[in-house]
Amino acid sequence: MSKEKFERTKPHVNVGTIGHVDHGKTTLTAAITKIMSKAHGGEFKDYSDIDNAPEERERGITISTAHVEYESEARHYAHVDCPGHADYVKNMITGAAQMDGAIIVIAATDGPMAQTREHILLSKQVGVPYIIVYMNKADMVDDEELVELVELEIRELLDEYDFPGDDTPVIFGSALKALEDDTSDIGVPSIIKLVEALDTYIPTPKRDTDKLFLMPIEDVFSISGRGTVVTGRIEAGIVNVGDELEIVGIKDTQTTTCTGVEMFRKLLDSGEAGDNVGVLLRGTKREEVERGQVLAKPGSIKPHSKFEAEVYILSKDEGGRHTPFFNNYRPQFYFRTTDVTGACQLPDGVEMVMPGDNVKMQVELLSPIAMEDGLRFAIREGGRTVGAGVVSKVAD
């Protein structure tokens, strides 16, 4: 009997819970898995399963994250929940858990708090495109007016960070009651409503193969009689033999043509996202291309040397620096396949950055790199990772 192939018929979407400590993120995550597993199969994860999240290392940074999955009528969801505030900061900056949308959990008893604000700002900086609000602990508030005030406050807060406050779904309920199988409006029905909001408010993300072609160049060879071959893993899109392409980054942008795609020593007509390939380029000399550049669809990506970034600096325990750094700090920035030196400008009023901090900074690289908002990078000193960051805005 051959093994049954895993059939994924439903589109896949990545989400997560964010919000202030003790507002009920983990209880909500448990409630969703319980109610959805009853309706559509899957596994119920209780609070302690999720709360004792294993530590993972992403780019040398220790992050505790719980991964759960569940299905709705229309989709398959992968959902991340982090036990501690620091884990969220690291997770969002490194992109260890890239979210197509986030559920921000706010206790109706408290309203938005410091970390609520910080998580919304981080979501904006790292490019989380959609936020849905679950107003939790509804069983502990009797005052209708208070609830309306909290809702108004959260909508204004979303507006402040350029999320559409007026259009954002706000679901009112009690994750604890739902977990206890309470069937009143604030119990199980509030979870069903929340998942319906996920289904309708967060668009199905584009698959990598539907995006514009991009391949970071890892190596360059010259094959006598055939020309120059660049190798790498295709990050997005599809490349076909005959396509015109651009080589972007480090030097001036050049145009070239793909005359062959090779994988596992076989010649193909095309290569797609996820494939490790060699791409044969016509009219491009070996010395004109180098590791760190990208091969891309013409006009799809530009080289930049100045950008604004959100950065997490590793703590000493994570193997990072032992001392703070100051304005004009000049480490290497590792983008995709290569290191480029850059200078850091700290925000006004920030004198220094300590290991374990997260900070917004302006960076100017010595040579330009193909980049767009949302690109992740590592910060290194002599090959050792000391930080992680994400481009929040290209500048030049």
Swiss-Prot record:
Cellular compartments per GO CC: cytoplasm
Record keywords: Cytoplasm, Elongation factor, GTP-binding, Hydrolase, Magnesium, Metal-binding, Nucleotide-binding, Protein biosynthesis
Binding site for GTP: 19-26, 81-85, 136-139
Catalysed reactions listed for this entry: GTP + H2O = GDP + phosphate + H(+)
G1, as annotated region: 19-26
Region annotation G4: where it falls in the sequence: 136-139
E.C. numbers: 3.6.5.3
Subcellular location: Cytoplasm
Region of interest: G5: 174-176
Record-listed Mg(2+) binding positions: 26
Key word Magnesium present: yes
Protein name: Elongation factor Tu 2
Organism: Ruthia magnifica subsp. Calyptogena magnifica
Designated gene of the protein: tuf2
